[in-house]
């Protein structure tokens, strides 16, 4: 990737492998809980859509984020965290659509 298109991943190669790019999206029914969750996410990530955040996190910060998400979990809601570049891991909390993705392609 050339430097002008690499604005989000502007880190040196030594630390590049240790950080993960994550996308967090959610569907929380309760207004108060949804507001509190978005405020929580603002400490870790950048809002890119109404219910979608992106972040580039160290392993320690990633673990903190995941641990904090548990406080907002409700069986009627859906919170999904996509870890891109770090094992291609997807975690979800609450209501699950039941869909299983065999292969993920990010364009």
Give residue spans per PLM region:
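Basic nucleic-acid-binding interfaces
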Residues: 1-4, 8-23, 29-107
């Amino acid at each position: 990737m050339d430097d002008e298109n690499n604005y989000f991943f502007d880190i040196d190669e030594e630390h590049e492998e240790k950080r993960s790019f994550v996308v967090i999206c959610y569907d929380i029914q309760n207004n108060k809980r949804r507001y509190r969750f978005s405020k929580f996410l603002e400490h870790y990530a950048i809002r890119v859509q109404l219910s979608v955040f992106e972040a580039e996190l160290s392993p320690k910060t990633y673990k903190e984020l995941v641990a904090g998400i548990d406080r907002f979990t409700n069986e009627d809601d859906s919170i999904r965290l996509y870890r891109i570049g770090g094992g291609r891991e997807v975690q979800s909390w609450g209501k699950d659509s039941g869909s299983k993705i065999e292969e993920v392609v990010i364009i």
